[in-house]
Amino acid sequence: MYTLRFVRENENLMREALRKRQYDESIVDQLLAVDEQRRKEVTSLQELNTRRNELTSVVSKKKKDGTDASQEIELLKKLKEEVSVKETIVSELESKIQEILKQLPNIPHESVPTGKDSSENVEVRRWGEPRTFAFEPKPHWEIGENMNILDFQRAAKISGSRFVAYQGLGALLELTLINFMVWTHVKDHGYTFVIPPYLVKSDTAFGTGHLPKFKDEMYYCPEDDLYLIPTAELPMVAYHSGEVLVEAELPKRYVAYSACFRREAGAAGRDTRGLIRRHQFNKVELIKITKPEDSYNELESMVSDAESILQLLELPYRVVLLCTGDMGFAAAKTYDIEVWMPSYGRYVEISSCSNTEGFQARRANVRMRRPDGSNDYPHMLNGSGLAVGRTLAAIMENYQREDGTFDIPQALRAFMFA
């Protein structure tokens, strides 16, 4: 989140960022117009307070001298009412300014390509070769249902559409993948494992940038003012909220497992079948808190950490740099990792890794203390390491046999039966 002062001093930069992101830059005009009105009202309020103070002195002097001050007292009463009204106006304008500031997205990093949507994202690299099948590859949901390891019908009976029940080998594989991912990130990459709460307060969701923009995409418990998390990013960004971290403690690297809950309103097409787009799914999330000067190197290593899971599982994938029009609200730069899905005939997103720079740190009030004693905002990074259900779907499709079953990757097999 940016301050009013920052927008005033960097108006052209903010306008350019909004244009690149396909946002309406008139929001800046609206903000500056409200600010101009606020400043006029503040000046008027200051003048009223000056007159009130002067009149108070006159009343005090007349009372001390024993002279009649009734006329001044009546004027003072009216002035106090005017001041009260003016203070309310100023307060309402300040609240309006804050609401507008909350709607401003992060400014894209200079290395992010300008584009209007996903069609203008830039492929960075590929790993592995998609397998050539001697038969028509089946979609993972058919494989799962035929093997009786994914049950969509009973899940729908229990909860409605776009839920799944894992059973038997399916449940065992889902759990094994979670453990495999977490253990790899802890043992090989130096992350600290956290299992966070799955329900968060409004302030927590605001810190990541999910509120107010994405309110309608989250499940909400109004009696408790708690949201079911769409990703462990929410509780983990808030993990150090209100704290001042010592620079020497950075970077902090966390790997968090959680169930995730998303309304997915408006989702349609092939992705709504199977495990790709569920209302509830499991995900392993990577979070970093870094010094500003180190954050882009840390972003590259985070992407590499997420890639390593796919490499160990020998799943073909590609890395894509998102353009300005396709990035998330809080991101300054984002890489997507997309895994090859044979039945789709294309790559499908399985991880998104972003540097939010100081944007989330400011919203969540996470600060760092430099060696000279000054305070700064650290940079916060997040990424999937990986989406578990999508990883299982990719295994089922890429390792499928002609008889409708599938092999288990060697790395996972050794881990599974350890």
Curated annotation (Swiss-Prot):
Reactions the enzyme catalyzes: tRNA(Ser) + L-serine + ATP = L-seryl-tRNA(Ser) + AMP + diphosphate + H(+); tRNA(Sec) + L-serine + ATP = L-seryl-tRNA(Sec) + AMP + diphosphate + H(+)
InterPro entries on file: aa-tRNA-synt_IIb, aa-tRNA-synth_II, aa-tRNA-synth_II/BPL/LPL, Ser-tRNA-ligase_type_1, Ser-tRNA-synth_1_N, SerRS_1_N_sf, SerRS_core, tRNA-bd_arm
Binding residue positions for ATP: R262, R263, E264, E349, I350, S351, S352
CDD domains in alphabetical order: SerRS_core
Principal location listed in the UniProt entry: cytoplasm
Location in the cell: Cytoplasm
Pfam families: Seryl_tRNA_N, tRNA-synt_2b
Binding annotation for L-serine: T231, A232, E233, E285, S384
The protein's Enzyme Commission number: 6.1.1.11
Assembly and binders: Homodimer. The tRNA molecule binds across the dimer.
Stated name of the protein: Serine--tRNA ligase
Gene: serS
